[in-house]
Swiss-Prot record:
Domain of life assignment: Bacteria
Catalytic activity field: adenosine(1518)/adenosine(1519) in 16S rRNA + 4 S-adenosyl-L-methionine = N(6)-dimethyladenosine(1518)/N(6)-dimethyladenosine(1519) in 16S rRNA + 4 S-adenosyl-L-homocysteine + 4 H(+)
Annotated organism of origin: Arthrobacter sp. (strain FB24)
Lineage of source species: Bacteria, Bacillati, Actinomycetota, Actinomycetes, Micrococcales
Homology family: Belongs to the class I-like SAM-binding methyltransferase superfamily. rRNA adenine N(6)-methyltransferase family. RsmA subfamily.
Main location: cytoplasm
Residues reported in the UniProt entry to bind S-adenosyl-L-methionine: 40, 42, 67, 88, 118, 135
InterPro entries reported for this sequence: KsgA/Erm, rRNA_Ade_diMease-like_C, rRNA_Ade_Mease_Trfase_CS, rRNA_Ade_methylase_Trfase_N, rRNA_adenine_dimethylase, SAM-dependent_MTases_sf
Stated name of the protein: Ribosomal RNA small subunit methyltransferase A
GO terms under cellular component: cytosol
EC id: 2.1.1.182
Amino acid sequence: MTKPIPAASGTAPAALFGASDVRRLAEEIGVRPTKTLGQNFVIDGNTIRRIVAAADIHADETVLEVGPGLGSLTLGLLDAAKSVVAVEIDPVLAAKLPGTVQQWRPGAAKDFHLVLADAMKVTELPVEPTALVANLPYNVAVPVVLHLLQHFPSLRHGLVMVQDEVADRLAAGPGSKTYGVPSVKAAWYSSMRKAGVIGMNVFWPAPKIHSGLVAFTRREPPVTSATREQVFAVIDAAFAQRRKTLRAALAGWAGSAAEAEQCLLAAGVDPTARGEVIDIAAFARIAEARQDRQA
């Protein structure tokens, strides 16, 4: 077992979990990672340091971590941030985590806040987070990111580790073959970019695919009189039939293909274009044009 050593000025970095530590902690509480919860625990300290460095966390920040699991990433975040608030859905893991933090980072235990909850249902936290850093379960990654960006405007930036294919989708721009609903909806809240790829062998159990890092920076949504819900409805309709022209794909949303064409023309969008080539600002203009025509 790696002995936990508090960080000190001018000394080596504080110890992080190795593979044996992760397996021992899991064994102590009888946990086996489950596919249902998308659990893959990071077992490599250098990977944790890489994630924390890529997240660009400042010493005065409060970080929101989703799915801390056994605490591999949590320890690295506590070393970098002012405080960490972690949201964990698994009650067994949640019960173990405070004790782990106390053992490995006793000086930072007071700066650690744990919330036992489903991240998709969290709308309030005990402290206001300024950054999101998380190793997200592959099966809920996009909904969780969008939910947190919606409900916590204090989140100014962050870094999420997701399935590499999902990372490509989140960071894609108009015209890319991976550009779709996740890309456009994420762009409502922030600018996203691919920040790296993580191999399979740094996890336990090892997933069958690589993971991708996505960094984001909050930005204001497009200036529009349309609501977020109205804009997102256009996005959903456009990509439900992504190979069709917008005139055809938005016919159901607008009431007819002819009405869809009028909305598109009013928004300055080519009716023969497809949704995969226009940006979030154009989707907002389309939603606004529809509202104006109904007024």
